Amino acid sequence: KADLERNSALIAERTGKSPRVLAWPYGRHNALTREIAAGLDMKVMLTLEDGINASDRPLDAIRRKIVRLQPDVGELAWQLTWLVAPPHPESMRVMHVDLDYIYDPDPGVQERNLGKLLDRVKAMGINTVFLQAYADPDGDGVADAVYFPNRHLPMRADLFGRAAWQLSSRTGVRVYAWMPLLAFKLPPSHPAAEDVVVSRRGMPTGAYRRLTPFSEKARSTISDIYQDLGRHAAFSGVLFHDDATLDEFEDDSPAAREAYRKAGLPGTAEAMDADASARSAWQEFKTRSLTAFSREMIDVLKRHQPDLKTARNIYARVVLEPAAQERFAQSLDDMLANYDWVALMAMPYLDGSADYAQFIERLVAAVDARPGALAKTVFELQAVDWRSRRPIDDMLTVRAMRL
């Protein structure tokens, strides 16, 4: 704020006019900097986001295009035409990157690993990286630590921000922060450490140990983690991990029971399980609750990453069998309406299917049955058969990509 005040006063002194328009350096801005600029009467702000400026575009987020390499008139006309009417919908060719494989306690080794990653990304010709921002060295799907400074979890290394910047600046890809929504392993002494998802009495718990989305302490903690992520790195989007689910026996924690009662539902999972009508309402309530909480985290991130895109993992079984919503608290229609992208886990052998190609064909047909859904769905293909730990035949993968 002091810099903007000083610069504004200097311009007014030298020109007799106070500045009213601010072009953000490298297009970088967030809600706080916009508020500061607006408070100094610079209410028109220029970003580096491509696109047209329609009448509903806010003045504090005016799009502009950088003209590079001195294009001729024809090339410039094509670029501008593409902005107004792209020849084909935006596509996503994505690679998942697990920072646990880049991290090393030896800084030299870690730097070499990062360099190899950049080379690999360039060679693959992709346009998007889902970059894991949390540490899961034991592979149980729960964040034991994270790769950015934060208030609640151990920081294994301050690696995410650097890797995201290197990937975006040196390879040109869009980087999405790949994050759990609920699966955080807080230190034992943390006030919210035991506010976890609980299964109905006598039933096994789900695949992941998760903080319950119905506890205010847990929600506040997760919100802080997302706020710290947004403050300490620059990235294009967020991918919510496949932990954002509640099965047919969850959640029966005290906080969840209280939330059910407030929503007019029976107060326990067992009571709802015994009533078909209540059970259906319970399923919908859980699905809506997970989506609503993820939307809150999106709003938290957008305070620092205003042009953030969003994606969320969905299990294939939910797409193939709508009744499976009960087992996952997920819905394809709900996700299509609430995120820029749906990241569909198209992994036949994970789902127990013996026919790889047929499974993918069924998935594509199920998504295509919804108008416009294919354009918003990215199919995450299984490249390794985890049962045998052997790579899947390249021709099967190529065939799936061509569908």
Annotate each language-model stretch with its function:
Residues 88-111, 164-165, 174-233, 268-276:
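Active-site-adjacent "subsite" loops/lids of carbohydrate-active enzymes
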Residues 112-139, 232-237, 335-343, 403:
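Catalytic domains of carbohydrate-active enzymes, especially glycoside hydrolases
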Residues 7, 22, 37, 121, ...:
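Conserved, mostly hydrophobic/aromatic
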Residues 20, 66-67, 93-108, 144-157, ...:
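The substrate-binding groove and active-site-proximal loops of carbohydrate-active enzymes
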Residues 88-100, 277, 308-319, 365-399:
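Active-site clefts of carbohydrate-active enzymes
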Residues 1, 120, 199-350:
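Polysaccharide-binding and catalytic clefts of secreted carbohydrate-active enzymes
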Residues 1-93:
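C-terminal active-site subregion of NodB/CE4 polysaccharide deacetylases
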Residues 115-118, 122, 135-183, 278-305:
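Aromatic-lined substrate-binding rim segments of carbohydrate-active enzymes
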